[in-house]
């Protein structure tokens, strides 16, 4: 009896030494993200501490699957395997994925339609929240951010920048070798320029963005690119996304398509003259979002709360805009008053929220996208 009493006393002593609340294991919210390492760092270093403070006992753990569509494909394969295995709970609560991955996962019933269950869902109206390269993802995703392609230009040289692709076509003839882009192999800023050109000159804007795909439209795409071959005689071909910015910095060209977030990052690092500007021309140029999604067998309540925080105007302003120079995932007008005046002017002085709403376009759906690249190689590059 004395031995049992001694054991009981020892157990009480051990329990007394354990901090209250740690007897029960923490709940882990698993965030799996495609993209570069900065995506993982953003979740672990910025979002996680805020969410954990709001939810004592919850631990956010982010892991990355790598950049590009390949990163999203790995998340798809992971969810698909767990679905086929009949797992009661999956080990991904929040997925951060590209458009192509989202389209596949919605089609295969791997994601929950959660957007209308979170208050921030009503703060998003851009078509990219509903349409992922022609696939209907309405309700299943919320954009984390939007990256956008636009024209960067030197206002000392380009006094009156073109407002449309038609005006640009006229401008390069009057200002030969002052415009540069990287074709379709050196980076997506050049690809975005080419798809923007086809949108402007083919009359196929809705079809390119939403489908359905019609292979009979290939001659229309090829015809729209005929003018681009002549256009290229008056321009400089740059070596890539960074190459276009570098040539702008050195004054070798005065205008060219760039990723806006790269543009502002280069400017902040002193790699571009501070007077450089950006412009989004009619009828528009493409950009692309990253999406927050909730898998079918996730910890749904916590996942929705996490995404609601991540897409709130306050976090979008501080985390997405100020830290990364990305455009917000929610409509930009909802950030007014959340950003200091300097940050607002920096990001929206040249391209307004209305410009993003009307001229920020998605890339064409996959089969048209491939047709454009193939036609460019045949009709323009050769």
Give names to the regions the model predicted.
Residues 34-44, 68-72, 92, 98-236, ...:
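Extracytoplasmic ligand-binding site segments that recognize negatively charged/polar headgroups
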Residues 88-96, 237, 254-259:
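Paired acidic/hydrophobic, glycine-rich loop segments that form the ligand-binding mouth/hinge
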Residues 102-104, 257-273:
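A ligand-binding cleft/hinge motif common to bilobed small-molecule-binding domains
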Residues 147, 222-231, 260, 272-293:
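Periplasmic-binding protein-like
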Residues 349-382:
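Conserved C-terminal helix/tail region of periplasmic/extracytoplasmic solute-binding proteins
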């Amino acid at each position: 009896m004395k031995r049992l009493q001694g054991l009981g006393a020892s157990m009480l002593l051990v329990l007394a030494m354990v901090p209250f609340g740690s007897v029960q294991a923490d709940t882990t919210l698993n965030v799996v993200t495609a993209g570069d390492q900065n995506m993982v760092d953003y979740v672990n270093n910025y979002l996680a501490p805020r969410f954990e403070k709001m939810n004592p006992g919850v631990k956010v753990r982010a892991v990355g699957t790598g950049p590009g569509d390949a990163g999203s494909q790995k998340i798809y394969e992971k969810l698909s395997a767990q679905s086929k295995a009949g797992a009661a709970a999956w080990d991904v609560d929040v997925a951060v994925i590209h458009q192509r991955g989202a389209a596949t996962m919605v089609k295969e019933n791997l994601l929950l339609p959660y957007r209308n269950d979170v208050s921030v869902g009503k703060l998003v109206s851009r078509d990219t929240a509903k349409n992922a390269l022609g696939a209907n993802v309405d309700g299943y995703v919320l954009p984390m951010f939007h990256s956008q392609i636009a024209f960067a230009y030197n206002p000392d040289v380009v006094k009156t920048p073109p407002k449309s692709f038609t005006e640009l076509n006229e401008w390069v003839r009057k200002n030969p070798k002052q415009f540069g882009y990287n074709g379709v192999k050196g980076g997506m800023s050049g690809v975005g320029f080419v798809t923007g050109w086809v949108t402007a000159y083919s009359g196929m804007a809705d079809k390119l963005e939403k489908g359905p795909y019609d292979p009979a439209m290939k001659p229309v795409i090829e015809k729209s690119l005929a003018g681009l071959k002549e256009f290229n005689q008056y321009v400089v071909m740059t070596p890539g996304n960074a190459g276009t910015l570098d040539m702008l910095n050195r004054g070798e060209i005065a205008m060219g398509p760039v990723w806006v977030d790269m543009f502002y990052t280069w400017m902040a690092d002193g790699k571009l003259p501070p007077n450089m500007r950006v412009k989004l021309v009619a009828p528009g140029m493409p950009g692309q979002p990253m999406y927050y999604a909730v898998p079918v067998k996730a910890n749904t309540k916590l996942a929705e709360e996490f995404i609601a925080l991540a897409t709130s105007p306050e976090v979008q302003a501080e985390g997405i805009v100020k830290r990364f120079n990305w455009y917000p995932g929610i409509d930009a007008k909802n950030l007014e008053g959340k950003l200091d005046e300097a940050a607002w002017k920096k990001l929206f002085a040249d391209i307004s929220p209305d410009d993003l709403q009307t001229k920020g376009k998605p890339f064409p759906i996959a089969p048209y996208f491939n047709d454009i690249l193939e036609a460019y190689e045949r009709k323009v590059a050769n």
